[in-house]
A protein has these predicted regions:
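Histidine-centered nuclease catalytic patch
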Residues: 94
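Conserved beta-strand-loop surface patch within small alpha/beta domains used
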Residues: 1-88, 97-161
Length: 161
């Protein structure tokens, strides 16, 4: 399902920003929304409901940093979403510096991957906040890959309530 706008409640933004500031390492989070209507159709708005911070283990190597989330944890989140009639529609994670380009590892380890999903990469381990309109890169999942939004598109489509 593709949306025109993603409406982000203050509680979801604050919980995400807090999770990102917990340590000087990469952190991953998921935003959920209610399951509504035709999953192949388009809806005007996604009303985000929750920030889910999975149990995760940070890693570092000469090639970069990452977090690993066990399959059982991802299954737990999906079952919880099912019980709540929600769906994971946005994945977010931090990068150590200002470079928020989507890496090949980001593509290989995508968690939320349906068409219309978002992947948001926040700079500096979230030290400056989420920076959704002026620092983070926002990507939208298309059939074959992720499409980078412009800063203008992010400002118009990500609505902080």
């Amino acid at each position: 399902m593709s949306y025109q706008r993603w409406k982000i409640p203050p509680s979801v933004a604050a919980e995400t920003a807090h999770a990102f500031r917990r340590g000087q390492h990469e952190v991953f989070a998921i935003w959920t929304a209610a399951v509504l209507g035709d999953p192949q159709g388009a809806s005007a708005d996604a009303d985000l409901l929750r920030c889910v911070v999975p149990d995760q283990a940070p890693g570092v190597a000469a090639t970069g940093v990452w977090v690993h989330i066990q399959g059982q944890e991802l299954q737990r989140i999906q079952l919880d979403n099912y019980r709540r009639r929600e769906r994971s529609i946005v994945q977010l994670h931090t990068h150590p510096g200002a470079d928020v380009r989507m890496s090949q590892l980001d593509r290989d380890w995508e968690v939320v991957r349906h068409v219309g999903a978002l992947s948001i990469i926040v700079p500096l381990y979230g030290a400056g906040g989420l920076r959704l309109h002026d620092g983070a890169n926002v990507y939208e999942r298309e059939a074959d890959d992720w499409r980078l939004w412009s800063r203008t598109e992010a400002a118009e489509r990500l609505v902080l309530e």
